[in-house]
């Protein structure tokens, strides 16, 4: 298995594999790792990869073009692309066991306020959260999932029997976000976001948040609108 990490902080992630079980598994070539810096694909002379949100809202979003270019560069037929975000289904041990059979997993790690939603729509094979809490970036989440996945690769654990014995804010998830360009890979930003009517944008975001929560987190109870 090969695991590729798309990130703004490759050096931050490398150190996790310098010790313990994962280091030994790498040395035995039971899996391999690769780190890709978004900035290497930036079209900005200052290597910036963040943009303001369309329609307003706090914080910046990762610009879609560098991430798309990075994915186009490294993706192969057998690649399985996973986006890390708190607004997704919960990663479980069942997922870890299933993904341990993949030949190539690509973790796309968020920063700032996350991704332009169109990236997920175009490229994601799966979208995972590791819990109802917010981190400063997706790197820790992808490392958590990687650890859980790699442990299920035959030969990684000294005792295979170990595997057999192992056992937000508010009620809604965040609505989709978008940044420039207005049209990306044939997908346009929702028109209401471009009109600047913040009351309508707020109402639309609320409805989108309800739909997203029902879709990704059916375990969350959502009260019916009155």
UniProtKB/Swiss-Prot annotation:
GO terms, biological process: tRNA N1-guanine methylation
Reactions performed catalytically: guanosine(37) in tRNA + S-adenosyl-L-methionine = N(1)-methylguanosine(37) in tRNA + S-adenosyl-L-homocysteine + H(+)
Subcellular location per the Swiss-Prot or TrEMBL entry: Cytoplasm
GO MF entry, a single one: tRNA (guanine(37)-N1)-methyltransferase activity
Function: Specifically methylates guanosine-37 in various tRNAs.
Residues engaged in binding S-adenosyl-L-methionine: 110, 130-135
Protein name: tRNA (guanine-N(1)-)-methyltransferase
InterPro entries: Alpha/beta_knot_MTases (IPR029028), tRNA_m1G_MeTrfase_C_sf (IPR023148), tRNA_m1G_MeTrfase_TrmD (IPR002649), tRNA_m1G_MTases_N (IPR029026), tRNA_MeTrfase_TRMD/TRM10 (IPR016009)
Pfam families xrefs: tRNA_m1G_MT
CDD domains in alphabetical order: TrmD-like
Keyword set, alphabetical order: Cytoplasm, Methyltransferase, S-adenosyl-L-methionine, Transferase, tRNA processing
EC numbers on record: 2.1.1.228
Subunit structure, interactors included: Homodimer.
Residue ranges the record marks as coiled coil: none
High-level lineage: Bacteria, Pseudomonadati, Campylobacterota, Epsilonproteobacteria, Nautiliales
Gene name, Swiss-Prot/TrEMBL: trmD
